Amino acid sequence: MEKINHFIELTRIKRPIGYMLLFWPCVWGLTIAYDFSNNIQIFLKYGVLFLCGSILMRSAGCIINDIVDKDFDAKVSRTKTRPIASGKISVKHGLLYSVFLCLIAFLVLIQFNMFTIILAMCSMPLAFSYPYMKRFTYWPQLFLG
């Protein structure tokens, strides 16, 4: 059970601000684009898909960030207890978990149209470059969009 808690901690699911920052722009876009004379269940379906995708991709991104920053995190009091930095979870297991979350997120993504799928796939290099951008700029969040 302790190992499961470390994997939950790795995703930062208990800190919702990260996935909400992904989710709200999606819902705003959906609300602006949606024709509410259609069935509201379709709107709700896409809202739930956006929420699931936001949680999954933010979680995968946190894991990649922890893998890239593990040596730095181990030296900083605020981050030294993170599961990868502290050695509670190996880099290999963290990477496998991140890939697993990305695969589930892809299953969510393919529920959308082809334009959305292509746009999302094109944004992936930007999202996963974030941990590296912290080494070159004071504004790495610009690469997240």
Residue ranges and their predicted role:
Residues 13-32, 145:
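The first (N-terminal) embedded transmembrane alpha-helix
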Residues 8-9, 82-145:
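Intramembrane alpha-helical segments
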Residues 2, 38-46, 79, 112, ...:
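Membrane-helix interfacial "entry" motifs
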Residues 1-7, 62-89:
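Cytosolic, membrane-interface loops and tails of multi-pass inner-membrane proteins
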Residues 19, 63, 71-74, 78, ...:
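Hydrophobic positions within alpha-helical membrane elements
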Residues 3-18, 92-94:
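N-terminal membrane topogenic signal
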Residues 27, 31-68, 78, 102-106, ...:
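Membrane-embedded alpha-helical segments that form the functional core of polytopic membrane enzymes
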